């Protein structure tokens, strides 16, 4: 009996969490390794290269359910149309996101194209502005869900229909985002970068219930702010503190992190990374990574600190990213450097 009640409470908890996901955007703990999702002005902002390719994967709630929540992304961007006289260039990029909640009852697929312009301001600073234009599809299948009306005190009666009446099982909409970045690099040992962005500028309508236009079925704009920095302590060690804040309607999230990159090979071709992040009142996130030439792999694990740790044993989510950046022209024998200022060992 106690086991049945506990199971019922857990199902209700995850049902409430699923409802919360309906109104929240996809996110990664490794926000610094998902640049186009963090800010569209990051398109073409690529230190040490003129192109970048990356993949992210997040697996959440695997410790308490056989059907965890999975979030995946692929992205790529490059620098084009450089203007050496004006010290500016254009960045182009693309981003695809896919999220599957639980047994697949709620899925979200998004695709964005990004464009940004980057302008050097004197010798040691850079200003960037960018825009994302994308298309989003969200689908739901209520057959895999259990509802409170199906709970009879001992178990869920699957023969009782407790699902709400939906007008449609999917929602499609155009989505617009914009962002602004500023970078300051007074010398080859200090790099500071901060930016702000606004998502859902057009406030698209997302609803499975209502066909009419109303404030209640429109997405709230999401405001993001981030800060990255790197300090080269010597030819072997770089320390990178960072922070991230996001606000959407009444939901907010604050994160801080610090990473240490160690030049294991001496010439910068092999790096070892260790870091620690903290999501306010929610989780602590250790990170480990290794870099080989232009490729960096980073693994992180969300250790739950909130009240949910009673259900998941503090095992929140694991996440990894794979990012490659390089220079296209070096393969054509020209060796042109990236327009973006470099920061290396």
Language-model segment annotations:
Residues 24-345:
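Subset of outer-membrane beta-barrel
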């Amino acid at each position: 009996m106690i086991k049945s009640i506990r199971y019922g409470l857990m199902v209700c908890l995850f049902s409430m969490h699923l409802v919360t996901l309906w109104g929240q955007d996809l996110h990664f703990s490794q926000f610094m390794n998902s640049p186009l999702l963090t800010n569209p002005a990051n398109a073409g902002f690529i230190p040490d290269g003129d192109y970048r390719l990356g993949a992210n994967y997040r697996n959440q709630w695997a410790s308490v359910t056989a059907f965890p929540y999975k979030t995946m992304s692929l992205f790529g961007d490059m620098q084009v149309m450089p203007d050496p006289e004006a010290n500016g260039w254009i960045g182009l990029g693309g981003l695809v996101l896919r999220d599957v909640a639980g047994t697949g009852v709620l899925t979200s697929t998004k695709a964005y194209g990004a464009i940004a312009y980057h302008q050097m301001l004197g010798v040691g600073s850079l200003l960037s502005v960018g825009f994302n234009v994308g298309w989003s599809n969200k689908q739901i299948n209520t057959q895999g869900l259990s509802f409170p009306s199906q709970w009879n005190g001992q178990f869920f009666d699957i023969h009782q229909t407790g699902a709400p009446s939906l007008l449609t099982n999917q929602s499609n909409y155009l989505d617009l985002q914009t962002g602004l970045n500023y970078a300051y690099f007074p010398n080859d040992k200090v790099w500071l970068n901060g930016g702000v962005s606004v998502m859902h500028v057009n406030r698209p309508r997302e609803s499975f219930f209502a066909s009419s236009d109303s404030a209640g079925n429109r997405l709230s704009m999401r405001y993001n702010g981030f800060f990255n920095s790197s300090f080269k302590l010597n030819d072997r060690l770089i320390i990178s503190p960072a922070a991230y804040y996001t606000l959407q309607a009444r939901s907010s999230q604050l994160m801080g992190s610090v990473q240490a990159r160690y030049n294991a090979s001496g010439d910068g071709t092999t790096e070892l990374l260790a870091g620690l992040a903290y999501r306010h009142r929610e989780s602590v996130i250790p990170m480990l990574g290794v870099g080989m030439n232009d490729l960096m792999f980073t693994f992180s694990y969300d250790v739950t600190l909130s009240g949910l740790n009673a259900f998941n044993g503090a095992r929140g989510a694991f996440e990894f990213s794979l990012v490659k950046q390089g220079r296209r022209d070096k393969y054509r024998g020209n060796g042109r450097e990236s327009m973006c200022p470099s920061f290396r060992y």
